[in-house]
Amino acid sequence: MGAITGVDGVDVVIGTSSFLREFSHGKDMAYITKTAIEVIEFVKTKGIEVRFSSEDSFRSDLVDLLSIYQTVDKIGVNRVGVADTVGCANPRQVYDLVRTLRGVVSCDIEVHLHNDTGMGKASKTLLVRLFTLLGQLLPTHTQR
């Protein structure tokens, strides 16, 4: 819908953790990947920016997560987003995931953190300090 209403960009978001796959939408990673490709390719035909984000990134299987990010990067998303949907990731986990992701995608990386446990602000501070030299890391957004 956003692609036909004149927006500048669209965020394609789907839950990738086993929790969300089982209790939210009931889809497996093959279905998620196939659907993401179809939606991203459609959005790209509209000439607008497209970001792919996984919901609940930090409780998702790392192999699954990196695989889908690599796939959407290859088809040309402008950026990928990782989300600490429930505010459970500590700064080291955020650093490790973003650093690993930087090694498998060439697009921009965006980080979305929640501060439920107080880790969002700490993670944001760490990311700003550690990734200043790496480039292509977009500013983080912390929600309470």
Region spans (language model):
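Alpha/beta enzyme core
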Residues: 1-109, 124-132
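Active-site capping/gating regions of soluble enzymes
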Residues: 73, 112-114, 118, 122-144
